[in-house]
Amino acid sequence: MNIAEAEIIVAGGRGLKKAENLEQLKRLADLLGGVVGVSRACVDAGWISASHQVGQTGKTVCPKIYLAFGISGAIQHLEGMRGADTIIAINNDPHAAIFNVADLGIVGDLFEILPMLIEAIEAKHNGAK
């Protein structure tokens, strides 16, 4: 699916720390029926292709839900995702610029929060079967 057409985007930034950590984002995106988006830092680091990049030098997106994990909120990135209906940001820096545009901001460790979200959604999916 083209990221610009996605209704749910699970996005990550430099706070992911390494390419392997994108796997959890992909898992959450799959569970939610969404796609993975990233900040320029992830593309520049070679972790993922530019087709997933959100921002002025990437794609402009307007999803219903934009989940941002470890994205500080550089103006170039924010410009690409401001059209989202609901922005949920998770960052360990309480002063991260992403919180200025987020509808819901969670100050916390994405490496604790992301696995808990995945587990809760998997449990709900398994209970619904």
Task: Set out the residue ranges of the language-model regions.
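N-terminal glycine-rich FAD/FM-binding segment characteristic of electron-transfer flavoproteins
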Residues: 1-129
